[in-house]
């Protein structure tokens, strides 16, 4: 109900959920950005997505069906695969020593939300999201990413 009300008022919706909540949100359609991980996407489309092309195809299906405008599949240490109507991009983070993955997904979604609001391309949005998610993993405990670490990793990714 919340997503429907927001959309009726012209508010773009971003969904980072799983299971029934993710499925229900996508049933409404026109979600601005959805960020499942590979396992969540596999459950959503009800098939194994063990190969990169399978993940890309499943994400493309969500976009082509109108359920989501952008799908960014988080792939853990392999980064993220992003798909929209213009195509797809995979962003792989630099090798880093991970201290904790707590908060990495939230950092990623927050960073991508910022870039969406700024009108960034799919590539830039995904690079910034991967940078923020990676920055969160170098912290101990439950700390989210820092702007300084995010910017450093983003610069690395844009120059790679």
Specify the residue positions occupied by each region the protein language model found.
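Conserved phosphate-binding/catalytic region of the ribokinase-like
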Residues: 4-9, 24, 52-160
């Amino acid at each position: 109900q919340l997503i429907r009300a927001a959309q009726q008022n012209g508010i773009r919706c971003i969904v980072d959920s799983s299971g029934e909540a993710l499925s229900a949100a996508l049933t409404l359609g026109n979600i601005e950005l959805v960020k499942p991980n590979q396992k969540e996407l596999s459950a959503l489309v009800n098939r194994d997505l063990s190969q990169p092309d399978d993940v890309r195809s499943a994400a493309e299906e969500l976009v082509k069906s109108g359920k989501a405008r952008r799908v960014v599949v988080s792939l853990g240490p392999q980064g993220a695969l992003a798909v929209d109507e213009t195509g797809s991009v995979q962003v792989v983070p630099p090798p880093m020593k991970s201290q904790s993955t707590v908060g990495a997904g939230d950092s990623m979604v927050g960073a991508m939300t910022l870039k969406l609001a700024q009108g960034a391309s799919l590539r830039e949005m995904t690079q910034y999201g991967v940078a923020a998610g990676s920055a969160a993993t170098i912290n101990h405990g439950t700390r989210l990413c820092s702007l300084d670490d995010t910017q450093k990793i983003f610069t690395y990714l844009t120059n790679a």
